[in-house]
Each structure stands twice: as structure tokens, then as C-alpha cells.
């Protein structure tokens, strides 16, 4: 009965995707309505697959895969593969800025040190944060809302037999490890999350702000920092980092009642380094839109049990099917709902699946394949900030 109701509702209120969707394809990927995908491509150490589905009126997720030289000096090392997933909130400006600048900063610092390292990654995050702060300062007088725009920022770097994973916010990187004796796959989460729905993150916020009993507030059954935002770390969200951007003309809902004594949110990434092993088969990098619907283990089993080609798109579809199931509606009906309204049913979802070939990893120093650079989303962006 509820499914019939949604049929009626979608036909009356939301135009069918068959009349409003557009489909195109090129070497960078394919677009089908609100879904963009690159089913299969090669990176330095194997294959990869990408998919993005839009729910917000403006796509707030951005993503990229870069493979080849990881420095600005193309003739020298290190060589590797870089994956970035940037889940924006409050608007698309910060995630787009990160997509345009973070990888370039990483290459610059890697060139200075002639290597990849935790320090290189941290400096790249810091430079990106400082760059966006400059954008906010420049636009504050005419566009104060930009101070309340931010982005989660998850990256992975495969280089010299190591995997570096860095994160701010609540996107997630999960490794699929195969158990040789059984052929089964286990999920190993490599990223730390910074969402105050997690008790340890709330405890961290209380320890950093012992004089503020309202640093984390339960509002409408959801934990939020200062009753406003769920993540405790991000790029951007300058209104919760710099007091000069937490005042008029910023909207009242973003302004704090009491003076800001110190930055409330942090840009500092949690960084892990994993020595890659032969049983490390693939990596899933995804925004929280995927993980709201699928567990880590469910996701790695889908990848393990299906063909590689189009596997990111398959994960997105599995998440959408679960979102439809939660609303007791059909998947086909969910797909008819237009962007904007769709956000009431699920978030923007970005997925990158990176397969790892042990033989290619062992020969990394001798590989000189063409560079790869693909951005997820297939959306024409306005002029850079």
C-alpha cells in the first residue's frame, strides 16, 4: 500500500526521470540522470571504479583519482596513486576548492621532501585550509555564508608499498583483505571518523573544551557540536574556527551566543600508514552517504562477489536499494525523485573502489605508465574560487 502511495506521490509532485534525465558519456565517465560513473579504468597498481549519485540540489560531493608522478617534478619520484573524496556541507564551494587544490599542494610538498610522508600530507591539508580561509576573507563582505560552508576530506595515497590514509570528517576508507584458506574477505577500516555521534569523539571534544558544558548538544535526537554541526573536524567551516567570521552579517543560526575562546572545529587530519600485504585486495573510499546504508563488511562482500567492472556503481545501487527499503518504497520509485527532494531520502553518495595488483605493487619503481586524472561527478563547475 505504501509503495502505491509513493507511486502516486512521485507522479504528481516530482517529474519522472525519464522526462528530465540526461545521458552522456566520454573518456572521463558517463552521466545518467543524477548518476555519474566510470565503470573501469587503470591506475598504476591495478584497476579502479568510480560512481557518484546526486541528492542535493547542488552536488556537494567531489572526488578524484590521480595516478603517476606524485610530485611537481614529473621526471622524478615518487610515483603512486592518489584518491580523494570530499563530502561538502552547507554548499559545494569548499569541496570544489579542495578538489582543485589539495593534490597540487601534496605534490609540491612531496617534491620538497623528495618522498611521500605523513608530514607531506599534513602540510597539504594545512595549506588547503589556509587557502580556503583566504577565500572566505576575500568574499566575506559580499557572501558571508561562505564562512559556514565546509567539507569532509578523505584521501588515500598508495606509494612505495605503503598506503597512507588521511581524514577529517566522517567519510571512510575500508580495506578488503582476503583470507586465503577460505577465499572470504574481511573488512578493515583504515580511517578515523570525526562525528560526534561517536562517543569517543564527544569525549575528545569535552577534553578540548572543558570550560564549555554545551560543546556537544543532543538536538532532535542527533548529537551536534554547539547544536549546529555533526563533524568535529573539517576543511572550511571557518565560522567555528575564527571569531571574526562568527558575527553579523552571518545568519543568526550559525552565530554563537558566547565569545569564541578557541577554534571549535579542527582541520587536523587523522593519518594512518599501512604496509600493504599480498592479501590486501582492494580499497573502498566513500562519503558517509554510502556508509549510512551499508556496513563495512556488506560493502567488501559486494566487491568480492561481483565483477570488477562497474563495481562502484553496484555499491551505489545497493545503498539506494537500502535507502528505498527503509522508506518502504521501491527502488524504481526512488530513482524518479529529483535532486533536492531526493536529499530527504539519502545523501550525495561517492564511491571509489581501488584494486591492488601485488605484482604491479612490487614493480612500482620501474613502472612508467601514462598519468591518470579523473574527477568524479561529471558536473560542469563554475569558475574556480
UniProtKB/Swiss-Prot annotation:
InterPro entries: PP2C, PP2C_BS, PPM-type-like_dom_sf, PPM-type_phosphatase-like_dom. Mn(2+) 1 binds at residues 87-88. Its cofactor is Mg(2+); Mn(2+). It holds the Pfam family PP2C. Keywords: Hydrolase, Magnesium, Manganese, Metal-binding, Phosphoprotein, Protein phosphatase, Signal. Its EC number is 3.1.3.16. Gene3D superfamilies: PPM-type phosphatase domain. GO terms for cellular component: plasma membrane. It catalyses: O-phospho-L-seryl-[protein] + H2O = L-seryl-[protein] + phosphate; O-phospho-L-threonyl-[protein] + H2O = L-threonyl-[protein] + phosphate. SMART domains: PP2Cc. Disruption phenotype: Plants missing PP2C42/PP2C-D2, PP2C64/PP2C-D5, PP2C79/PP2C-D7, PP2C63/PP2C-D8 and PP2C68/PP2C-D9 exhibit an increased hypocotyl length, as well as an enhanced sensitivity to LiCl and media acidification. GO terms for molecular function: metal ion binding; protein serine/threonine phosphatase activity. Residues 47-356 form the PPM-type phosphatase domain. Disulfide bonds: none annotated. The keyword Methyltransferase does not apply. Residues 1-18 form the signal peptide. The keyword Manganese applies. Binds 2 magnesium or manganese ions per subunit. SUPFAM superfamilies: PP2C-like (SSF81606). GO terms for biological process: positive regulation of cellular response to heat. May dephosphorylate and repress plasma membrane H(+)-ATPases (PM H(+)-ATPases, e.g. AHA1 and AHA2), thus influencing negatively plant growth and fitness. This is Probable protein phosphatase 2C 79. The gene is PP2C79.
Amino acid at each position: 500500500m505504501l509503495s502505491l502511495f509513493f507511486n502516486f506521490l512521485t507522479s504528481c509532485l516530482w517529474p519522472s526521470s525519464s522526462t528530465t534525465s540526461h545521458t552522456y558519456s566520454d573518456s572521463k565517465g558517463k552521466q545518467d540522470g543524477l548518476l555519474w560513473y566510470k565503470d573501469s579504468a587503470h591506475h598504476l597498481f591495478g584497476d579502479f571504479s568510480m560512481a557518484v549519485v546526486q541528492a542535493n540540489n547542488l552536488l556537494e560531493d567531489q572526488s578524484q583519482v590521480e595516478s603517476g608522478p606524485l610530485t611537481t617534478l614529473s621526471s622524478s619520484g615518487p610515483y603512486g596513486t592518489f584518491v580523494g573524496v570530499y563530502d561538502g556541507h552547507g554548499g559545494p564551494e569548499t569541496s570544489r576548492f579542495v578538489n582543485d587544490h589539495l593534490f597540487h599542494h601534496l605534490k609540491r610538498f612531496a617534491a620538497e621532501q623528495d618522498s611521500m610522508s605523513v608530514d607531506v600530507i599534513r602540510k597539504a591539508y594545512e595549506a588547503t585550509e589556509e587557502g580556503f580561509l583566504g577565500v572566505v576573507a576575500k568574499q566575506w563582505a559580499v557572501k558571508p555564508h561562505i564562512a559556514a560552508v565546509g567539507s569532509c576530506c578523505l584521501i588515500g595515497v598508495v606509494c612505495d608499498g605503503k598506503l597512507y590514509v588521511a581524514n577529517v570528517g566522517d567519510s571512510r576508507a575500508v580495506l578488503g583483505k582476503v583470507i586465503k584458506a577460505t577465499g572470504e574477505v574481511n573488512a578493515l577500516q583504515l580511517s578515523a571518523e570525526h562525528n560526534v555521534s561517536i562517543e569517543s569523539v564527544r569525549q575528545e571534544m569535552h577534553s578540548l573544551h572543558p570550560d564549555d558544558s554545551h560543546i556537544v548538544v543532543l538536538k532532535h535526537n542527533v548529537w551536534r557540536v554547539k547544536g549546529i554541526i555533526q563533524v568535529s573536524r573539517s576543511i572550511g567551516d571557518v565560522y567555528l574556527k575564527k571569531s571574526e567570521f562568527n558575527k553579523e552579517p552571518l545568519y543568526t543560526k550559525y552565530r554563537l551566543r558566547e565569545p569564541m575562546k578557541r577554534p571549535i572545529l579542527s582541520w587536523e587530519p587523522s593519518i594512518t600508514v599501512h604496509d600493504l600485504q599480498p592479501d590486501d585486495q582492494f580499497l573502498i573510499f566513500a562519503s558517509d552517504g554510502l556508509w549510512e546504508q551499508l556496513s563495512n563488511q556488506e560493502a567488501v562482500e559486494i566487491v568480492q562477489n561481483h565483477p570488477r567492472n562497474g563495481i562502484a556503481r553496484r555499491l551505489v545501487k545497493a545503498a539506494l536499494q537500502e535507502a528505498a527499503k527503509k522508506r518502504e518504497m521501491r527502488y524504481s520509485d526512488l530513482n524518479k525523485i529529483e535532486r533536492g527532494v531526493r536529499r530527504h531520502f539519502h545523501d550525495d553518495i561517492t564511491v571509489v573502489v581501488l584494486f591492488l595488483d601485488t605484482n604491479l605493487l612490487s614493480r612500482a619503481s620501474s613502472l612508467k605508465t601514462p598519468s591518470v586524472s579523473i574527477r568524479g561527478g561529471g558536473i560542469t563547475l563554475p569558475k574556480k574560487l
